[in-house]
Amino acid sequence: MQAIGTIFVVTSTYPNLTDAQRSASELVKRGLSRCAQVKGAVTAYYEWQGEFSEAEEYVVDFKVSEVKHHEFYAAFMELHPYDVPQYYWSEVKASPHYAEWVNTPLVHEDQ
């Protein structure tokens, strides 16, 4: 059996479905994320600039290779509509085949 592989899963939230889908699509098309999953709406409760807030947000999980992580982050920040977006990642274990797929450069990157 092959060794377990490793990938990064980056999680963020967006103020609406359109922004979530746009970022997910663009980051995958640029080859910076191998897969992005836009999840349904959640309700966020938070303090921002001294005020209590409640907002509907959309969660997106991006699958990113360790090699692409810094480039992904720069593009993510460029595309995200929030001044201070939620951005956290986990290094996770994945099946060997899935990790290989996430970590293999896209075909159009070599052209």
Annotated model-derived regions:
Residues 1-111:
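Positively charged, small/polar-rich N-terminal and surface patches that mediate targeting and assembly
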